[in-house]
UniProtKB/Swiss-Prot annotation:
Residues 487-499 have a biased composition (Acidic residues). Keywords: Endoplasmic reticulum, ER-Golgi transport, Golgi apparatus, Protein transport, Repeat, Transport, WD repeat. Belongs to the WD repeat SEC31 family. Required for protein transport from the endoplasmic reticulum to the Golgi apparatus. It comes from Arabidopsis thaliana (Mouse-ear cress). This is Protein transport protein SEC31 homolog A. Interacts with MAG5, SEC13A and SEC13B. The keyword DNA repair does not apply. GO terms for biological process: endoplasmic reticulum to Golgi vesicle-mediated transport; protein transport. InterPro entries: Sec16_Sec23-bd (IPR024298), SEC31-like (IPR040251), WD40/YVTN_repeat-like_dom_sf (IPR015943), WD40_repeat_CS (IPR019775), WD40_repeat_dom_sf (IPR036322), WD40_rpt (IPR001680).
């Protein structure tokens, strides 16, 4: 490709070490079209944002002589350092690059000592105040720019070390007192500047034009010749100068200039009289890229240190070109292969250092951040940081988890009360207030709910009034001052004698039905009801119903609904705005499952009418977690104003779990599953991996969506992997009885209807004591509580102190102190277990020989047969050859027998999931084919996917497979 920027000059170049400027000094011996003999030093700005191809001139000045070499160092009073030029007359000119706003380059002074053109010139990078110069008189001068009146060191070879014209010199990159110089007579000398002594030298028969120290290996140096007969570049070790380390072959004529890449020592730039400018891979000696071939050769090349991959090349035909090396071809203009593709083809594992990140960071799962910095002493050192971006949220989660672990309703009521006080909206205040009521003591929830809705019993109001002295006094005064006058005498009610006679005749003959009809005709409702009562049940009921139908009083509709036990019909006739009155009525009269259905129906009506808050509260009363979470989830985005998404999810999760304490729901809706997924992600992102795993364990594996399964696996893999090994080893120990592991207590309902749904949330710690045991039913299923400090990782088998999955539980997330939702009175069941009764002897666990397999499905029978055969093949050969003691052999055999016996019992009872049974069938088929490798792979797959269900016998099965394979061999 063509150059990206250019300058129309035939000049030597020096690039500023820190600033985007390039200096150009007129080349000695160059002739332009104007045949001018002037000498100029100019500074151009390297502005790659500009669309102009020509660089902008920002400063210039005239020089007394033309230049043979130009260098730009960082030493100087200004931030741009100093420019040094090796002149034809033997002087060294010093310039201040930018001395004023006018852009004039200020000439500082000349350094005079040499008696011939100065061709070698370089600042010491490690000691910026030192400038080395070499001239045609064969001398090398070291100038201290702090005191430049004379050279601080004067180096000149004698005898066999005599050098002719100095063509190039270079400071060692590792030792600031070591300098190398080369000359046209082929002599290269390594100097100890401090002692002005020669360390070593190299004599060749060819002219040496340029040399460069290896920036990485301080004992290696590059030397090139400008003779056409020897156009090679040699890398020499100063300890073994007669044998080059590497030779770079590519130029057809002599090499004039070269420079090592300051950004990556893997690359070297050379130019020669064959019109080629080549970039080399110094590790392999191969050509990496090449500049487009011009009409004439380049005599000066440099790397731009501030932008790796950008180079400058000065040509004899009067042009300074700025090139992007990455756009150059690999083998010249004839083969336009891109620089990048050549790199990948030549060394696919190596990239330029400027493409590599000097530092980097990456966020990891579990609130982790990993970072690296290539400038550190240890290149392979990385840092792992734990980040909690929501510190206030982490504190909230910890407090909420502590409230759940406590398991006491007082702490949960305190949480609800605190949330009610902190609520920023009326909706939140109403929600938390209702949740607090649902956690009240037995018998109080019903009364509290009605009071919360604004309806109290008269006795409650009288009791409250009696406690107020001023109210008592006022009521007494009213009784004294407002006296009802006594009637002077009874006045007979006027009536039509005709109706009276007709009614009387009907009664005389016993025609009660006609008498009632006559009373209705005369609008004597009370008389009709009295006569109907005498006339029998059928007449009484028909008369009563007719009276109710004729009545216009609103309260009579309530009476009708109660008499007909048809609250559902009455509910659908109610106005949505009167939902509190309707809910209070249901709370008073509904019983059993009717409470749930009525609350659900009322909530549905309210939701359809747009009363979202009222519908939510009714769903809460019904214990309908799914519907409640659906509504809360829909309003999640609306509530996010002023709060982060994580805080909104935390609010929603807190309400959901508190609601779950008083309900039972075996179903997991999509909204609830999504809520758990979002909450687990938030917990994991804040580094709360163990807490996230606890909540995910509340869900049965069948309830996991693909996304949730992936999240669970990531969390389980991130958790302590050694927990699986620890738990697997403990499976061989005898099982110890644990009351909280073996029994689950379902509390009796409160004084109102008990929801029929079941939820799957449980207290974080086992209840310390079960009070009022007579209110609890007989334990039904396993109860696994949660222990923060001892909870195993996901891939460990469940045990004491861990959550139990939702579908394996009946009891809600409660202990003896947590009430259920509002419910009508139900007679508590007497527990079948008594403390004083001696427990029955525990039956021995099933073994391979004793397990009942009569009910194992036909397609699973081969599993029993294959594993029984594997058991026999595993232990029978060991009885005569094992080094273990007989007791240990018997213990191992019995343990494996018990594990398989437990598996056979699960198969017999149908307690194995479909996925586990299918994998187990595949495993046994592999065993039947003697393909133990495939069997082990299936066992490993089950370990990662079915561990919760199969952890008790999977390790034993693996041992048997491994032993069986060894026996076959």
């Amino acid at each position: 490709m063509d150059c990206i920027k250019s300058i129309g000059r035939s000049a030597f170049v020096a690039i500023a070490p820190e600033s985007p400027f390039i200096a150009a000094g007129t080349m000695a011996g160059a002739v332009d079209l104007s045949f001018s003999s002037s000498a100029n030093l100019e500074i151009f700005e390297l502005d790659f944002q500009s669309n102009d191809r020509e660089l902008k001139l920002v400063g210039q000045c005239q020089s007394s002589e033309r230049f043979n070499r130009l260098a730009w160092g960082s030493y100087g009073s200004g931030s741009d350092g100093l420019i040094a030029g090796g002149l034809v007359d033997g002087n060294i000119g010093l310039w201040n690059p930018i001395s004023s706003e006018s852009g004039e380059i200020a000439h500082v002074r000349d350094l005079s000592k040499h008696k011939g053109p100065v061709r070698g010139l370089e600042f010491n990078v490690k000691s910026p105040n030192q400038l080395a110069s070499g001239a045609d008189d064969g001398t090398v001068c070291i100038w201290d720019l702090a005191n430049p009146s004379k050279p601080s060191h004067y180096l000149k070879g004698t005898g066999s070390y005599m050098q002719s014209e100095i063509s190039s010199l270079s400071w060692n990159k590792g030792f600031q007192h070591v300098l190398a110089s080369t000359s046209h007579n082929g002599t290269t000398v390594i100097w100890d500047v401090n002692n002005e002594k020669i360390i070593t030298d190299l004599k060749t028969t060819v002219r040496c034009s340029v040399l460069q120290w290896d920036p990485d290996h301080f004992n290696q140096i590059l030397v090139a010749s400008d003779e056409d007969s020897s156009p090679n570049v040699k890398l020499l070790d100063i300890r073994y100068l007669q044998s080059p380390v590497r030779t770079f072959v590519g130029h057809q004529r002599g090499v004039i200039a070269m420079e090592w890449c300051p950004s990556d020592s893997l690359y070297l730039l050379t130019c020669g009289k064959d019109n080629r400018t080549i970039c080399w891979n110094t590790k392999t000696g191969k050509i990496v890229a090449e500049l487009p071939t011009g009409q004439n050769w380049n005599f000066d090349v440099h790397w731009y240190p501030k932008m790796p991959g950008v180079i400058s090349a000065s040509s004899v035909d009067g042009k300074i070109g700025i090139y992007n090396l990455e756009g150059c071809s690999s083998y010249g203009t004839e083969n336009q292969q891109h620089f990048l593709f050549h790199l990948l083809d030549a060394d696919p594992l190596t990239a330029p250092k400027w493409w590599k990140r000097p530092a980097g960071a990456s966020f990891g799962f579990g609130g982790k951040l990993i970072s690296f910095n290539k400038n550190l002493p240890e290149a392979s050192e990385v840092f792992l940081h734990s980040l909690a971006t929501e510190k206030s949220l982490v504190n909230r989660i910890s407090k909420f988890e502590a409230a759940l672990e406590n398991g006491e309703k007082t702490s949960l009521r305190g949480l609800c009360e605190k949330k009610t006080e902190e609520a920023e909206s009326e909706e939140e205040k109403e929600t938390w207030g209702l949740l607090k009521i649902m956690l009240e003591e037995d018998g109080n929830a019903k009364t509290k709910l009605r009071s919360h809705l604004g309806f109290s019993l008269p006795s409650e109001e009288n009791d409250q009034t009696a406690n107020e002295p001023h109210a008592t006094c006022s009521s007494t005064n009213v009784e004294e001052t407002q006296k009802v006058p006594e009637p002077e005498g009874e006045e007979e009610e006027s009536s039509d004698p005709t109706f009276d006679d007709a009614i009387q005749r009907s009664l005389i003959v016993g025609d009660y039905k006609e008498a009632v009809a006559q009373c209705f005709s005369a609008n004597k409702m009370a008389d009709a009801l009295v006569i109907a009562h005498v006339g029998g049940t059928e007449l009484w009921e028909s008369t009563r119903d007719k009276y109710i139908r004729m009545s216009n009083a609103p309260y009579m509709k309530v009476v009708s609904a109660m008499m007909n036990n048809d609250l559902m019909t009455y509910l659908h006739t109610r106005q949505p705005k009167s939902w509190k009155e309707t809910l209070a009525l249901i709370c008073t009269f509904a019983e059993g499952d009717e409470w749930i259905s009525l609350c659900d129906a009322l909530a549905s009506n309210l939701m359809a009418a747009g009363f979202t808050l009222a519908a939510t509260l009714c769903y809460i009363c019904a214990g309908n977690v799914d519907k409640t979470v659906d509504i809360w989830s829909m309003s999640l985005e609306k509530q996010s104003a002023g709060k982060s998404y994580a805080e909104c999810v935390q609010d929603l999760m807190e309400k959901t779990l508190v609601l779950a304490l008083t309900t039972c729901n075996k179903r997991v809706s999509a909204s609830l599953r999504k809520l758990f997924e979002s909450y687990a992600e938030i917990l994991a992102s804040q580094g709360l991996i163990a807490t996230a795993m606890k909540f995910l364990k509340l869900l049965e594996s069948g309830d996991f969506s693909p996304e949730l399964s992936i999240l669970r696996d990531r969390i389980s893999l991130y958790a302590e992997p050694e927990a699986a090994n620890t738990s697997a080893s403990t499976n061989t120990q005898p099982k110890i009885s644990n009351p909280y592991q073996e029994k689950s207590f379902t509390p009796a309902p409160l004084s109102n209807a008990q929801p029929s749904r079941s939820i799957t949330f449980f207290p974080l710690n086992p209840p310390r004591e079960l009070k009022n045991a007579d209110q609890y039913q007989q334990p039904t299923m396993d109860y696994h509580s949660f222990n923060r400090s001892a909870g195993p990782a996901y891939n460990a088998p469940p045990g004491p102190g861990s959550y139990r999955s939702i579908h394996s539980q009946v009891g809600p997330y409660i202990n003896s102190k947590i009430p259920q939702t509002v419910a009508p009175p139900v007679r508590p069941m007497t527990p079948t277990h008594q403390v004083a009764v001696q427990p029955e002897p525990v039956a021995p666990p099933p073994t391979v020989q004793t397990a009942d397999t009569s009910n194992v499905p036909a397609h699973q029978k081969p599993i029993v047969a294959s594993l029984t055969r594997l058991f026999k093949e595993t232990f029978e050969p060991l009885r005569g050859y094992s080094r273990d003691t007989p007791a240990k052999k018997r213990e191992a055999e019995d343990n494996c027998s018990r594990k398989l016996g437990a598996l056979f019992s699960k198969l017999n009872n149908g307690d194995i999931s479909k996925n586990a049974a299918e994998k187990l069938t595949q495993l046994c088929q592999a065993l039947d084919k003697r393909d133990f490798g495939a069997a082990l792979k299936i066992q490993g797959l089950m370990t990662s996917t079915e561990w919760d269900e199969c952890s008790s016998w999977l390790p034993t099965l693996k041992k048997m497979i491994v032993t069986g394979r060894q026996n076959v061999r």
